[in-house]
Amino acid sequence: TEAKMWDLMEYDIPVAREIQDRFNCQTDSKFTKVLAGGYMPTHIDPGRTAVVMFSLTDNPSPIIYFDGQKKLFTHQYKCATIINAKIHHGVPVNTSDRIAFQVNLYLTWDEACKMHQKGTLYDSHI
């Protein structure tokens, strides 16, 4: 099995930029795709601390968090989800194409959680 994955970091999609611009912190964004039969290796993200994931495909394979080789928990995306990118995570089994729009956050995890709880992380007003 191979990774079969890619990132699209340069794009001109106005609605994606509008979503990214509504975050009240430093962000950048990208689209990711992992093909069916591929996988996303277990990793800790090197720069970003948190990621807001917008799944663009139905029933994406779940993300799994690890402590060494031990599974901590499995999360099935059903809506936009913020993840802690500094905990080992991956998608070891990908049964269908998995496409997502990701907004990368560079706050500490605690700062991101506090802003989310206060309703200040994202400006939802049009």
Outline where the language-model segments fall.
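Non-heme Fe(II)/2-oxoglutarate
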Residues: T1-N24
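Short, charged, solvent-exposed linker or helix-capping segments at domain edges/interfaces
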Residues: Y11, I64-F66, A112-Q117
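Catalytic core of non-heme Fe(II) oxygenases with the double-stranded beta-helix
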Residues: R17-A85, I99
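Short catalytic/ligand-binding loop motif for oxyanion handling, primarily in non-cytosolic enzymes
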Residues: G38-T42, H89-P92, W109-K114
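Alpha-helical and His/Cys-centered functional microenvironments
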Residues: G47, V93, Y106
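Short beta-strand-to-loop capping motifs
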Residues: L56, V103-L107
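Ligand-binding loop in jelly-roll beta-barrel domains
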Residues: K86-F101
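Active-site or metal-binding loop neighborhoods of secreted/extracellular toxin and effector enzymes
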Residues: S96, Y106-I126
